Amino acid sequence: MKLTEAYHDALAALPATPPLPTAVANATEAAAGSEEGKQDGFSKVKVKEKFMNELNKIPLPPWALVAIAIVAIILGLTCCFCICKKCLLKKKNKKKGKEKGGKNAMTMKDVKEMGKSGKEQALKDEDEDAETGLTTDGKEEEKEDEKLGKLQFSLDYDFQNNQLIVGIIQAAELPALDVGGTSDPYVKVFVLPDKKKKYETKVHRKTLNPVFNESFIFKIPYSELGGKTLVMAVYDFDRFSKHDVIGEAKVPMNTVDFGHVTEEWRDLQGAEKEEQEKLGDICFSLRYVPTAGKLTVVILEAKNLKKMDVGGLSDPYVKIHLMQNGKRLKKKKTTIKKNTLNPYYNESFSFEVPFEQIQKVQVVVTVLDYDKIGKNDAIGKVFVGYNSTAAELRHWSDMLANPRRPIAQWHTLQPEEEVDATLGMKK
């Protein structure tokens, strides 16, 4: 009995032994995993070794490789930063748009009301302009006229000598045409329709309210005076370019009472462009050394010369005369520049002029067109020195005020006949 019971107990105990195979399976799996891990580790090491070998093959020093790596990292960081910033800005803009849309949202009724109010306001403005008799163009013209300034002058007539006496007293509230916020004004005075005789005041530097106090005489018989018109044009002087006209005042002589001296202010109006034939401009410098009695004239260049040849060009050269009392003392000339209307010379000429004579001489500059066959025709002329006016007088005065220093200036060429008449030259 005891043996049978023990046998049965042994049989009952047999099912409790299955955990042994699972442990063995786990052990085998762990062993396999460890083998795979070892293989992965070996493969990683091999990749690193290959990478380092490839790096060693590159013909660059280690510090260069380090620098490249640093630059790459910095670029990556900056790209990330920019992307983050853009995302944040987009979110902010969306929020702002929503807030504005909520606050400033308009209905169709609001739009219609705004349209009606705008139309009503425009009609009111038009009615106001109609009442005052002004259009928008008129307003602009008035503003332009106001900016031109005004001129004070006097008029008198000498019946015994048949002379019209014009006094240019002063100007006020002139516009600023120079960079420094001022102008260099002077006044041209002439009588229409002939324009034969023109006068110019002295140039006043850096002022918008110049005081001239200069008088000019025109010899006109009283019987012819009624058909004349006096023109007083204010200009802004510029040494290196064309003088800008500021404005002008026109006075028909048949509207003036010459029974007494007339003195009045006139607002300057927009001046008409002078329709004078353009002969060109010339630039030259003047230098005077008083101790040596040496006057140096450098002919620099000319521009926009009149076309004298059939082909639409010229062969210009320049003559320089030193004159006194209508007599030519010395003569110089430049080289000839072929087929051009804008010649460049940069040629220097010297004259001996004692200090006591410098105020009595004149330098006459003539631009001529060279011709092989016929006579060389004069294109234009200008003179500085004694008896010169306006820009020419200013150039001469600046030279005397700055001894030993070359003073360059552009001059507009005048017709030869007019200059010769002023100089009293005999051909």
UniProtKB/Swiss-Prot annotation:
Gene name of the encoded protein: P65-A
GO BP: calcium ion-regulated exocytosis of neurotransmitter; synaptic vesicle endocytosis
Chain segments annotated as coiled-coil in the UniProt record: none
Residues covered by the C2 domain: 147-266, 278-411
Cofactor binding, note field: Binds 3 Ca(2+) ions per subunit. The ions are bound to the C2 domains.
Protein name from the UniProt record: Synaptotagmin-A
Location in or out of the cell: Cytoplasmic vesicle, Secretory vesicle, Synaptic vesicle membrane; Synapse
One CC-aspect GO term: axon
Similarity field: Belongs to the synaptotagmin family.
GO terms, molecular function: calcium ion binding; calcium-dependent phospholipid binding; clathrin binding; phosphatidylserine binding; SNARE binding
Binding site for Ca(2+) 5: D309, D369, D371, D377
Chain segments carrying region Phospholipid binding: 141-387
Membrane as UniProt keyword: yes
Annotated Pfam families: C2
Region (Disordered): 96-145
Biased composition (Basic and acidic residues): 109-124
Tissue: Forebrain, cerebellum and neuroendocrine cells.
Side Vesicular, residues: 1-57
Functional description taken from the UniProt entry: May have a regulatory role in the membrane interactions during trafficking of synaptic vesicles at the active zone of the synapse. It binds acidic phospholipids with a specificity that requires the presence of both an acidic head group and a diacyl backbone.
Residue ranges annotated as Cytoplasmic topological domain: 85-427
Residues binding Ca(2+) 4, per UniProt: D309, D315, D369, D371
Native source organism of the sequence: Diplobatis ommata
Membrane topology value: Single-pass membrane protein
Binding site for Ca(2+) 1: D178, D184, D236, F237, D238
